[in-house]
Structures are given as C-alpha cells and as structure tokens.
Amino acid sequence: MPQRIELTSEPVRKPRSTESSLLRKIQRACRSTLPEPDLGLNLDVADYINSKQGATPREAVLAIEKLVNNGDTQAAVFALSLLDVLVKNCGYSIHLQISRKEFLNDLVKRFPEQPPLRYSKVQQMILEAIEEWYQTICKHASYKDDLQYINDMHKLLKYKGYTFPKVGSENLAVLRPNDQLRTPSELQEEQERAQAAKLEELLRSGKPDDLKEANKLMKIMAGFKDDTKVAVKQAINNELNKLKRKADLFNEMLTSADEPDLENEAIQELYGDLKSAQPKFKKLIEEERDDDALVSNLSKFNDLVIQLLKRYKSIKGMKEEELNVPDTNEPAKELNLIDFDDDTTANTPSVTSPSKSLQPFDDLLGDFNKVSLSSPKSPQENDTVVDILGDAHSKSSGIDLLDFDSQPGESKTALSAYSNSIVLPNGLLNSSSNSKEITAQSQRHILNQSDHLRIDYELTRESMTKLRLVIFYSNISSDPITNFALLVASPKGTTLSLQPQSGNMLQSNSRDGIKQIASVEGISVNLGKPIKLKWKANYCTKGDSKEESGTTSLPTI
C-alpha cells in the first residue's frame, strides 16, 4: 500500500543524497548545461583526489567511464576532458586506474569492429587520449611496466585499422618526466604514494597472484626508509650528474663567444633548469647533512651555479634579486619603477600640475582622470589600459595602474635597468623615406622572468605608426599556474589593443602555453626614443595567489 502524504509533528527534512562528494563534483564538472569544459571544476576534482587518495582515483575513473558510455555526446566530451586533466595532474594513482583492462575495454566499447569512415567527436578524443598515454607514460614513466594494457590496447586498435591522431608537443611535454632536482623527502613521498595506490588496487583485486604481490609490497613499505635508501641516493646522484652536465654546457655556451646569443632557446632552457634547481640545494644539504662528501660536493656545485647565474644576468643586464646582489650605484627610487598598490610617497612629484611644455611621451600616462580599464573583447575602444581577461574586480578595485613614480625628464634614466635587458634589433627598418615600404623582422625578447612565470614577446612594425606584439607566456616551475590574467598600460597618446588570451592556465614546465596578440597605435617611426609599457600579472599556483609587476621598454624600430 503506497504511503500517504500527511502532516505530522515531525520536522520535514530533505532526504540526504547517497552520492559522495567526489561524484557530485564530477557531475557538476560534466553537466550538459555547460557551454564548454570548465577547467576550474576539473582542477577541483583533481585537487580533491590528490588530497583524499585511497579509493577516490578508482571511483573517479568508474564515474567517468559511465559518463562516456551513457549516450550523451556532450557529457561524454566533458568527461573525457576531465579525464585528461586528472591524468596530467594526479600522477600514478590515476595512471594505474586507466591502465586496467576492464577500464580500457569499456572505454572502446562503442567502437565498431571495422573503423568508420569518419570518427565521432568522442571516438576522436578517445583515440587521441590513448595515443598520448602511449607516447608518454608508457614509454618514459619509471612505472611503465604497470601500464602494459595501454600498450596492448594501442596495438589492438591499430591492428583493427584505427588511425591515431597526432598529439601536440605541448601535451606530450606535460606527461613526460622532467629532470628537476628532487630532495630525498620528495622522492620518498612520491614512492610511498605510488606504492600505496598499487597496494590498494592489488588488495581490491583479491586474486591469488595479486595478493602475493601485495604481501611483498607491504614488506617493502614497512622497511621503506632502510631498504630503498641506496636507491634514493642513486636517484639524487643521477639528477645531480644531469645538472652538472647542463652547467658545463651552459658555461661553455656563455664563454664560447665574446657576445653569446642569449636569445638562443638552448641557453634560455639551461638557465631556467639551473635557476629552478638552485633553491633545492639548501634542502638537500639540510636533509643529507650526515653525508659529508655529498654536502661538500653540493656546496661547491651550488657556488658554481650561482656564479653561472650571475654571469648570465650580468650579460643580460638583469637585476639579481634572487641572488641578493643589489646594485649599489642605482638610486633606490629607480628600483621601484612601478607599484600598483603602494601609496605615493612624499617625494613623488605631483601629477595634478604637469608642465604645459610636456609632450605626450614625456608625460607618460600622466592624465590619470582619463584612464580606464577595457576588455580585450572590444579592442576598437581607445582605452589606454587593457584588462586582458576583463575581470570585473580589476575595473573597480581602485588600483592606480599608471603611477610611474618618476618625472618626465627622468624617463630614460628610470628605465635603464629594464632597457638593458632588451637586445635592440639592428636593421629592422630598411627605408630611406616614409613613402617607402616598411620591413620589420621578428625577434623574441624577454619581458619578465621569475621563479614561476616567463613572459616573452616578438615585436614588429605593421605601419608608420603601429607596432604589433605577439606575447608568449610560459610556466618555468613544476606546479601548474591557473587563473592567469594580465593588466597592461601604454603611454598617453597611444592606443593599445589586445586580442583575448588563448587560455588562462599553464601546465607545469610548459613553454609558450598561452599566446596573445597586441598592437599599439600611435608610435611614430621617427619618435627616436623607446616606448615603455607597464604591466601587472596575477595568477594562482599551489593554492596561493601571486602578483608580479614591472615596466619594460620596447626596442625602437
């Protein structure tokens, strides 16, 4: 007999959902009402799995598998996008789950025996994912022996006549292991997490052979610190030897010529590797302080790396903030060329009464009352400052983007530290009069480089009064960068137009992960002085909000 609806003295309570927090997060990230895959929601799922571990990787993969095969194309596309984020951010625990035979069979369950003339969107994404796994973790991961079923599925599909799409180099680079130096504690933590994930899967299987393997693994885990101490030291020595070879090559490239080509990609990559590894030396020395020989070698190598970084920066003309070697000859005022948040000091010249004789480029961005923030979606507006992502909080936060803290006559001096870091291209203009055709060569320059973020740009001249910039954003750290946004200001009397960024997330150690095109109108060929741009970058990494800012001088072309 069906239960009647009637009023009672008991309070009405909403029935509790039987779904776990993880499943709710996955459903939210893959719901069909989304216009496109939401990277923020996908990363939220990845962070949840990394924090919980245990059975969550398997639970997530099973939920994604059901969404892929439920018949809803849009939900399947979102589920595969989520799976891609998990594979790239959750490590071995997810890699072990996608290598299970049951998962791979269900993933291709809707593939016909004979390949169709044209693949569906879901089939195309599945083939691309399997090819990406095959080219990266199945070949280069230290645990590649645990991923044999992915190799088998790749061979089977190829035998059936399926063709795999070409995977972009940036996607392959994310999953390939990097050569970054790691401390013993980091190596131990990584190994323990991998062993715990494997033990979880072996116990869940319950097969006799798997239980025997689980018994061996538990013995290894119980005596991990003693049994694998030699292996950990060997891994550290291998990584140090790789770094020493890089340091020798870097030193040779810096000393092989009187004026080394610092724009060379190999030199920049070696510099980035050594710079990111140098802070780890202190941790290694602290953790291995009982090993006198290793500590001595590390101290000597650390001194060598610091000297190489100093030499590179002295050639490049960069400030040595990370190495704590300030330039004592430079006025303190010039060290703070741009400050988006600090109040104006008493020594700062007043901006309310500029001289009448100032030219537009002398009074750089001086008329603050007319400055506004604009979105890159409407580049036709003549706004001087552009908020690349059009964030609402950027437009109302009251930040004074255009306080350069310098008088017009000091513009050249105040930019000396920054302009020295830019190599002025020669022969960019090949014209004897304004009526002749302007030709420009594209050369990459470094706008800024920090511990996490590197910004490069290529500068060309499109017309007698217009410059074009192609800006590249790279992540030089081992942690992903999310919610990336940039604010840029150009001089008064010019018009800065920006196209939208190609994205707002940078995977770890990704080069040119985001690209953007900008143009500055109103820069005459005969100006005769460099133009400076003011910028501020905001992003998140490892859960912390970061902010970088500065001023750069564009080469005269």
Curated annotation (Swiss-Prot):
Residues 192-317 form the GAT domain. One of its GO terms (molecular function) is ubiquitin binding. It comes from the Eukaryota. It holds the Pfam family Alpha_adaptinC2. Residues 440-556 form the GAE domain. One of its GO terms (biological process) is Golgi to endosome transport. The modification Phosphothreonine is found at T348. The modification Phosphoserine is found at S353, S357, S378, S394. Residues 29-165 form the VHS domain. Its main location: Golgi. It is found in: Golgi apparatus, trans-Golgi network. The keyword Lipid metabolism does not apply. One of its GO terms (cellular component) is cytosol. InterPro entries: ARF-binding, Clathrin_a/b/g-adaptin_app_Ig, Clathrin_app_Ig-like_sf, ENTH_VHS, GAE_dom, GAT_dom, GAT_sf, GGA_N-GAT. Gene3D superfamilies: 1.20.5.170, 1.20.58.160, 1.25.40.90, 2.60.40.1230. Keywords: Coiled coil, Golgi apparatus, Phosphoprotein, Protein transport, Transport. Present with 656 molecules/cell in log phase SD medium. May play a role in the regulation of membrane traffic through the trans-Golgi network. PANTHER family: ADP-RIBOSYLATION FACTOR-BINDING PROTEIN GGA1-RELATED (PTHR47180:SF1). Binds to ARF1 and ARF2. This is ADP-ribosylation factor-binding protein GGA1. It comes from Saccharomyces cerevisiae (strain ATCC 204508 / S288c). The lineage of its organism: Eukaryota, Fungi, Dikarya, Ascomycota, Saccharomycotina.
